[in-house]
Structure formats: C-alpha cells, structure tokens
C-alpha cells in the first residue's frame, strides 16, 4: 500500500500541494487529474522523491520513505517513468535496458559464481531485456543508439526502463505526451497489461479524459494544490466540484 499523509510543499508563500492524504492499494489504477497548475506533477515529484516535502509523509508497505531520496525510493519499490536523462546515450537501446535489468537484480545472486554461471546470467539478462523491448514494440531498435531515437520511441524506452526496475508502484506522468496516433496505443496497451497484475499499484497523470475514464479504477482530482474529489470515474466526473474546478464550468446563477 502506497500512502501520502498530509503531504504538502510550499514555495515561498505559495502552497503548491496542500495536505494531500491518499492511499493507493495494489491492483488498482488511479488517475490524478486537474487543471493546469493544479499540483499534479508536483505531487508526483513529492511521492517519487524529486522534491522534498515541506510537511507530511510518504509510506510504502508500512515503511516511511519521506526522508529517502529518489534513488532510494526506487530501490524501495517506487518506479516512475522519466525523460531520458540518466542513460548512456552512446550505448544501444538493448544495452541500456540490460544494464537496468542487471542493476535491479544485483544482490539476488550469490557471490563467487563460476564462469559458466556468469555467462548464463549474462544470457538471462539479455533475454529479459529483449522481452521487455518486445513488449513496448522496440525490438527493431534494439541495436540503435539511444541518442538516435525519435520522440515516440524515447517514450517507449522510458516505459521499458521502468519495467526493468520491477517496481511495486508504477508512476506514469502523461505517458503518451508527444506520441502520434500509431504510437500511443502501444503504451496504453502496456498499461492495460500491467493493470492485470493485482500485486502492482499504478498512478497515472493524464489530461486525456477518454483515456482516464477507460483505464482508471479511481480518479483523484487536485485543484489549487488541494484534493477536491476522489472516487470512481463516473461519480467523480459527474460531481459539481469537478465540473467547476476541472472542466471550468461556471456555476449557474440562482
């Protein structure tokens, strides 16, 4: 179970996220929505450790993560898809994913392996990386340098690297942004498949409400940094507070 308890952050006198408390259970996909400037990405940054909270806390599986940095939270089971800033651009797509798989599996094998064990492990890492690339339709790009990828394939690689981490929690911030009509369905299909694993928790920031209503089991609405609605998609989207805050529908005069 992922939880945030009264999670807040202030920038000077501005409260960007205001005491947001939420619990996200395994086997669910929660979409976090709201107008521009609502605090969605800032909230994501607080959860993943990219920003330090001014107050409140983050918990995963009963363990407090608030004082941990982003890398430590990743090791604890939080996985977030990021722009390609921490890769080896001169290496191939396959090599980058294989390194991510290897890093994830460090410590799972006994030390002092013989040469045959080392070779077998290398082969296993390669097969796992190839399987991940196939799942995001990137197998044809396996030998290409990361720096040569077009935008749509970069987004696919972000998801591939997230899968290599084998996290308990998958965090997607607008995963299809900038992708064309042929590319976006690949990522959405992958998220649907991830959703079938009832041991995983998925958080999704997404502006496309047709995608949200199709994929989400639950919608959390932020407005001016505060949680203003939380529930099943049909109920939340029909509520007056969401019509006003998120959709910008003005109140009718009495």
Predicted regions located by residue number:
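Glycine-rich phosphate-binding loops of nucleotide-dependent enzymes
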Residues: 1-254
């Amino acid at each position: 179970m992922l939880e945030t308890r009264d999670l807040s952050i202030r920038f000077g006198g501005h409260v960007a996220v205001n005491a947001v408390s939420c619990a996200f259970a395994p086997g669910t996909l929660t979409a976090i929505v709201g107008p521009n400037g609502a605090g969605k990405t800032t909230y994501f940054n607080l959860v993943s450790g990219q920003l330090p909270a001014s107050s409140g806390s983050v918990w995963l599986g009963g363990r407090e993560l608030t004082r941990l940095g982003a890398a430590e939270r990743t090791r604890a089971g939080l996985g977030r898809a990021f722009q390609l800033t921490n890769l080896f651009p001169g290496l191939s797509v396959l090599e980058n994913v294989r390194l991510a798989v290897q890093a994830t599996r460090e410590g799972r094998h006994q030390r002092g392996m013989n040469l045959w064990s080392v070779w077998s492990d290398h082969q296993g890492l390669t097969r796992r990386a190839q399987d991940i690339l196939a799942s995001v339709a990137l197998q044809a790009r396996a030998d290409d340098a990361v720096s040569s990828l077009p935008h749509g394939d970069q987004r696919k690689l972000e998801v591939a690297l997230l899968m290599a981490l084998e996290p308990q929690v998958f965090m997607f911030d607008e995963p299809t942004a900038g992708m064309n009509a042929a590319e976006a369905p690949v990522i959405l299909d992958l998220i649907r498949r991830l959703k079938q694993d009832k041991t995983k928790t998925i958080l999704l920031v997404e502006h496309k409400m047709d995608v949200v209503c199709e994929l989400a089991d639950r919608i959390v609405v932020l407005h001016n940094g505060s949680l203003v609605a939380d529930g099943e998609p049909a109920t939340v989207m029909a509520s007056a507070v969401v019509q006003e805050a998120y959709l910008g529908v003005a109140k009718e005069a009495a």
